[in-house]
């Protein structure tokens, strides 16, 4: 791998933080900040477009931080798909490993997220088809690389004025219990098996989330706005019914088996009665996504071939990803070792 030529950097203080960026990035202005860093929009003079520049907060604060930084960099570098956020540039002002403390990532600047769009307007069935088709097209690609998003929700789906969609923040989420507690959107879109640790989950946790998102686009309301884990599960089972004995017996968790078995029996509702007025094909697809048994839940590839997407589905234009080496996930390295790996990724 060849090394990038080092650009000229300039310094600027924004929101009480020093930003040190290459001269090609001008007119920095704050977009937002989260637990893992803050984001500025900037004009990329070289490419002639506005971009998002993310400065990771304390990327090497702990082994967990350093590994997360490495994971994010590797994932973004691997993703090359129209419906998935990819990496345009990565840089650090450091000239040596010793001085390497900051990591900046540059991605496409996306305008609204799906949350903004649902709040502002009632979507037509055609809009819903196109948006959900793009999410599934992205998931087919991500899942083919053995990557699970784990945290799909409307705020992680960026949409531009042409209704073109990109998935953000994927594969990073190894969410802790406290982030899932209470009346939080993070949990409303979560598959029950991941929320309650029922069993080893698979790629279809993301399909459950798509079902929740699709239902919300069709109705304008959150499908399962649970106030806590238990209430969330009750809301889910009012629609899906309680799990059959055959599914309960496959749950490795003794606690989960006992708890689910103790619940009063609830029958599955007729989805057509719940989603009144929706396209029958949309209802049929929802019924195949919102299935408690992960082995029976539809996959992204299967969903793309569903008749609901007849006007968009093109098997020759729904690509898969190159294999993605995740062997680093099982490695226990020291902070300095992760830092060195990130430095090499940053230089190339």
From Swiss-Prot:
InterPro entries: Kinase-like_dom_sf, MAP_kinase, MAP_kinase_CS, MAPK_p38-like, Prot_kinase_dom, Protein_kinase_ATP_BS. Dually phosphorylated on Thr-181 and Tyr-183, which activates the enzyme. GO terms for cellular component: cytoplasm; nucleus. ATP binds at residues 31-39, 54. Its EC number is 2.7.11.24. PROSITE patterns: MAPK, PROTEIN_KINASE_ATP, PROTEIN_KINASE_DOM. It catalyses: L-seryl-[protein] + ATP = O-phospho-L-seryl-[protein] + ADP + H(+); L-threonyl-[protein] + ATP = O-phospho-L-threonyl-[protein] + ADP + H(+). Pfam families: Pkinase. One of its GO terms (molecular function) is protein serine/threonine kinase activity. The modification Phosphotyrosine is found at residue 183. Its cofactor is Mg(2+). The active site is at 169 (proton acceptor). Serine/threonine kinase which acts as an essential component of the MAP kinase signal transduction pathway. Mapk14b is one of the four p38 MAPKs which play an important role in the cascades of cellular responses evoked by extracellular stimuli such as pro-inflammatory cytokines or physical stress leading to direct activation of transcription factors. Accordingly, p38 MAPKs phosphorylate a broad range of proteins and it has been estimated that they may have approximately 200 to 300 substrates each. Belongs to the protein kinase superfamily. CMGC Ser/Thr protein kinase family. MAP kinase subfamily. The TXY motif contains the threonine and tyrosine residues whose phosphorylation activates the MAP kinases. This is Mitogen-activated protein kinase 14B. It comes from Danio rerio. The gene is mapk14b.
């Amino acid at each position: 791998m060849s090394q990038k030529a080092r650009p000229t950097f300039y310094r600027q203080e924004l929101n009480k933080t020093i930003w040190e960026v290459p001269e090609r990035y001008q007119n920095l202005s704050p977009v937002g900040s989260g637990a893992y860093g803050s984001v500025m929009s900037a004009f990329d003079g070289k490419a002639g477009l506005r971009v998002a520049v993310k400065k990771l907060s304390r990327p090497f604060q702990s082994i967990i931080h350093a590994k997360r930084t490495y994971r994010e960099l590797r994932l973004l570098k691997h993703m090359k798909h129209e419906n998935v956020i990819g990496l345009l540039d990565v840089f650090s002002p450091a000239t040596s490993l010793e001085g390497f403390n900051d990591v900046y990532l540059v991605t496409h600047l996306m305008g609204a997220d799906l949350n903004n769009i649902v709040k502002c307007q009632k979507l037509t069935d055609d809009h819903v088809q196109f948006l959900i088709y793009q999410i599934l097209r992205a998931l087919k690609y991500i899942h083919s690389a053995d990557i699970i998003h784990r945290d799909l929700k409307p705020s992680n789906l960026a949409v531009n004025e042409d209704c073109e969609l990109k998935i953000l923040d994927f594969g990073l989420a190894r969410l802790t219990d406290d982030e899932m507690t209470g009346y939080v959107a993070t949990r409303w879109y979560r598959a029950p098996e991941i929320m309650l640790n029922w069993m080893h989950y698979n790629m279809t946790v993301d399909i459950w989330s798509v079902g929740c998102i699709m239902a919300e686009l069709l109705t304008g309301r959150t499908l399962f706005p649970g106030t806590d884990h238990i209430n969330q599960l009750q809301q889910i089972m009012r629609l899906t019914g309680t799990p059959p004995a055959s599914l309960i017996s496959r749950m490795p968790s003794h606690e989960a088996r006992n708890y689910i078995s103790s619940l009063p029996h609830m029958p599955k509702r007729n989805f057509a009665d719940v989603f009144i007025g929706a396209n029958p094909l949309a209802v049929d697809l929802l019924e195949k996504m919102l299935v408690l048994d992960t082995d029976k839940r539809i996959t992204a590839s299967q969903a793309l071939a569903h008749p609901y997407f007849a006007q968009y589905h093109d098997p020759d234009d729904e690509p898969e990803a190159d294999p993605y080496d995740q062997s680093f996930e099982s490695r226990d390295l020291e902070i300095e070792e992760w830092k060195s790996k990130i430095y090499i990724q940053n230089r190339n």
